[in-house]
Amino acid sequence: MPIRILPPILANQIAAGEVVERPSSVVKELVENSLDAGADRVEIDIDKGGAKLIRIRDNGCGVAKDELVLALSRHATSKVATLDDLEGICSLGFRGEALASISSVSRLTFTSRTQDQSEAWQAQAEGREMNVTVKPAAHPVGTTVEVVDLFFNTPARRKFMRSEKTEFAHIDELVRRIALSRFDVTLILRHNGKVMRQYKAANTVAEQERRLAAVCGTPFMHHALAVESEHSDVRLWGWLALPEGARPQNDLQYTYVNGRMMRDKLINHAIRQAYDELLPTDRFAAYVLYIELDPHQVDVNVHPAKHEVRFHQARLIHDFIFQALFTALRREGVSAAHQEEPLAETLVELPVSGQIEYPGQAPRPEWYGAEHSYRAPASTNEVREGSAARAGNYQPPEPPSREAMRSMGALLTTLPGAGPASAASATAAMVPSAAAQTAPGVWQALTLVEQAYLLLVRDGQLALLSLVRAERLLLRNWLLEAWGQGLAAQPLLLPVSFKLPKNLIALVEAQERLLKRMGLELKSGGRDTMILTRVPALLRQTDLVRLLPELLQIIESGSDSDASQLAEVLCQWLVEQGISHEKIYDFSTANRLLTELVADFSDQLADIRMVRPVSLTTVLEAFAHDG
């Protein structure tokens, strides 16, 4: 077959394969054209899920009679003229393909009138050559586009359309997304002549929140946290749901870049990281977030349907989004999906200790138990009340007796083939299986409890291993071993600046070597400002503005103490910041921790502060009493 130039209609139909996927794609392209035309009212009429009719009416600037023919031609647009225009594009559309592509797979009528014209004109492309005919029409200032019988001339495409209900659901979701992107525009959606959605223009904060509630639902608003952050020429604002407002599916996740609807992997990854450890694996965050930046710093011409963008400084944007959301969530005082709490009296015989200890721990220095009065300035988002006390009140416990060690201290191993039980959320212990009873004298893993404890059994006796305490113990020992060489520092793409009083600024300069050993590098940012440029991986996902003043306070209090004692305290502090009480574990991670504990501590795991006996006596007596 010789090379030939394709007929216009076939070329447009090929282009329509990328632009026009389904009726909602047509609605998207046409509504975006209306918004680019400056419309503040857009009406959308749908019949039969869009298969029979799609009509978009707006009150925008309209298209002049002389430009109607061009409007239905390929690669004809008023939005770009040079490469510089494309690289800094602000409009939603810019390729000039939508109308030509849609008209090639439907019967399209384009009616428009500008403010300067006394009458409206109507254009329609017909025939093999897509010749455009123009005739007078009655129409107010603005534009109406009617798309009738979508895919009438491409039966294969029409065959793949879903049911009327499904196709309209896609259109409805699209309109919801548009409603959140342009609060200043009134949107009306009708289906088969019935008004389904009506969003009035929202110009005040209260009106915007009402629209947000109308789109996302009242439950979202009950848990919504307003966020706003700015760095250099990048701004992030919007709303995100606290963890208790998480959903069973990801149907309330809306992100916009310079007003453009977006499903970007980089943005989604940063948001997931910000929620890390706050949500169980079967729950999804809900959010409506807007990112604004210099149009020259983002490439929107990377996806046929413009669903994705490419940031020129992707890592910078990722870290900015993560840090802004992470800080907002933690400063709000949110709690994770799990909090370590004392277990019920019927299950655990010993109270849960408030601090993490370990066998053979060296006694704390006297100064470390003292209360501190330092509070960071308000401009640095002052340290949470009581954080200094929490950091300073470590009391050395009494070491476990030999009898206690013998009573609990057999080697802990994992039974081959053991796996998680059904629901790990129950706090009641499970009865050992027959397989578990085949290994007398050895503790064996049974299941997770509340995704934070590992249930163990030995000779019919049950016990709980605190996974947070186990991981903290392992990390603490690793830090002490690595202390001599120092922790590796990782650069922050977004350096953190905060104000400090003069005494702490002097402390930073005096203890520069110690801070570098912890993987922290700071430099002066002015009279009373310090800038944090590098941190250890352990602290990369923490609220650094809150933690740094707390750390400096601890160093100041212990500056006169023995170097080894100070190292001990600082390692413990790093551990507590790096591993949250709210961390969630899966069974494989729990088994890995158990294996490492066995390798490092052997029978010293008898320490009752990490492994606690579970008593079923009360429950069994109750069963016996009930007969």
Swiss-Prot record:
Region (Disordered): 376-404
UniProt keyword annotations, A-Z: DNA damage, DNA repair
Gene Ontology cellular component annotations, sorted alphabetically: mismatch repair complex
CDD domains linked: HATPase_MutL-MLH-PMS-like, MutL_Trans_MutL
GO MF term list: ATP binding; ATP hydrolysis activity; ATP-dependent DNA damage sensor activity; mismatched DNA binding
UniProt keyword annotation of Lipid biosynthesis present: no
SUPFAM superfamilies: ATPase domain of HSP90 chaperone/DNA topoisomerase II/histidine kinase, DNA mismatch repair protein MutL, Ribosomal protein S5 domain 2-like
Single GO biological process annotation from the record: mismatch repair
Origin superkingdom: Bacteria
PANTHER family found in the cross-reference section: DNA MISMATCH REPAIR PROTEIN MLH, PMS, MUTL (PTHR10073), DNA MISMATCH REPAIR PROTEIN MLH1 (PTHR10073:SF12)
Family note: Belongs to the DNA mismatch repair MutL/HexB family.
Function: This protein is involved in the repair of mismatches in DNA. It is required for dam-dependent methyl-directed DNA mismatch repair. May act as a 'molecular matchmaker', a protein that promotes the formation of a stable complex between two or more DNA-binding proteins in an ATP-dependent manner without itself being part of a final effector complex.
Protein name: DNA mismatch repair protein MutL
Native species: Aeromonas salmonicida (strain A449)
Chain's gene name: mutL
